Amino acid sequence: MANITAAMVKALREKTGAGMMDCKKALVEAEGNEEKAVEILRKKGLAKAAKKADRNAAEGRVEIYISDDYKKGSIAEVNCETDFVAKTDEFIEFVSETVKTINVNDIADTEALNKAPFGAGTFEEELKVKIAKIGENIVVRRIGTIKAPENGIVNGYIHAGGKVGVLVAAACDSEKTCEAIKDTLRDIAMHIAAMKPQYLNPEAVPADVIEKEKEIAKAQLLKEGKPEQVIDKIIPGKIKRFYSDVCVTEQEYVKAEKKETVAEALSKAAKAAGGEAKLVDFIRFEVGEGLVKNACNMADEVAAALS
C-alpha cells in the first residue's frame, strides 16, 4: 500500500476542489498515483453531478466574447441555483471561458458545445466536474453568435454584473466607417439592454403579429365610438407607434441629446466619418428570462437535503 502523505492530499484537493477525505480515499484507491486519483474523483464527481441535474437553476450570468477584429461576437447564458454562486470568481471565469470556446470554435448549439475540447477533457465532462466542485446544478441554457457582414462590425455590452448581455451588428460602407462607429455601436447595445426591443426593424416583425395589433387597435377604436372610415386612417399611426416600442431601429435613442431614433443616431455617427451604416442584427439575453425561480426557503432546502 502506497504511503499517502498530507502534502499529496493537499495537492489533489487544490487540483480538483474535492473534499479532503474524498481526496485521501481516491489516492489510496489509486495507490498514490495522482492522475489516477483525479480520474477516480472525476468519475465520482459525475455521479454527484447527476444527482444535482434535476435541481432548479434560474440564477446565473450572461457573458459575451468579441473577436479582436470585431467581426464575430458570441453570447451565452449559464444558469446556476443561487445568486451567491453566480457572483463567485470561479463561476464567472467558467462562464467567460465557455463563451470564448463558443466563439473560437464556431459552436452553434449546446450539443456541439458539449463535445468541444475544454480544460482537461470535453466541455460536458468539465461541466459535470464543475457541478460536483461547486455543489450546484449548472446549465448552459442558450448560446448565440453574430458574424459581421463584409465591411461590418460587431460590438456588445454586459449590464448589471452579467444579468443582461447584448450583441449588436452593423453593416458599413467601409472598414473606416466600421472603426468610426465602434463606440456608438456599444452605446446602442447599452440601449438594447435597457429598452428590451423584440425586433430589429419593422420588416422583421411577423405579419401575424402586425395583424393582431391592427385587430386590437380596431377593437379599441370601435369601443371609443370611432366610425369605420376614420378607423382606417388612424390604424397606420398606431402601428407606427407599435414599431417605435418593439423595433430597435425605430426606438427613441436613450443617449440622444435631441429626439432621434436608434437608426438615425447610428447613421449620424457614420456620416460624421463620411460613411454610411445600418443595424443588421442583435441578440439580447437576460438571466432567468422565462424561467420560474425556486421559491423555497432555507428551512425547505435543508429538509429537502435531509430527505
Curated annotation (Swiss-Prot):
InterPro entries: EF-Ts_dimer_sf, Transl_elong_EFTs/EF1B, Transl_elong_EFTs/EF1B_dimer, Transl_elong_Ts_CS, UBA-like_sf. One of its GO terms (molecular function) is translation elongation factor activity. GO terms for cellular component: cytoplasm. CDD domains: UBA_EF-Ts. It comes from the Bacteria. SUPFAM superfamilies: Elongation factor Ts (EF-Ts), dimerisation domain, UBA-like. Residues 82-85 are annotated as: Involved in Mg(2+) ion dislocation from EF-Tu. It is found in: Cytoplasm. Keywords: Cytoplasm, Elongation factor, Protein biosynthesis. It holds the Pfam family EF_TS. Transmembrane segments: none annotated. Belongs to the EF-Ts family. NCBIfam families: tsf. Associates with the EF-Tu.GDP complex and induces the exchange of GDP to GTP. It remains bound to the aminoacyl-tRNA.EF-Tu.GTP complex up to the GTP hydrolysis stage on the ribosome. This is Elongation factor Ts. It comes from Nautilia profundicola (strain ATCC BAA-1463 / DSM 18972 / AmH). The lineage of its organism: Bacteria, Pseudomonadati, Campylobacterota, Epsilonproteobacteria, Nautiliales.
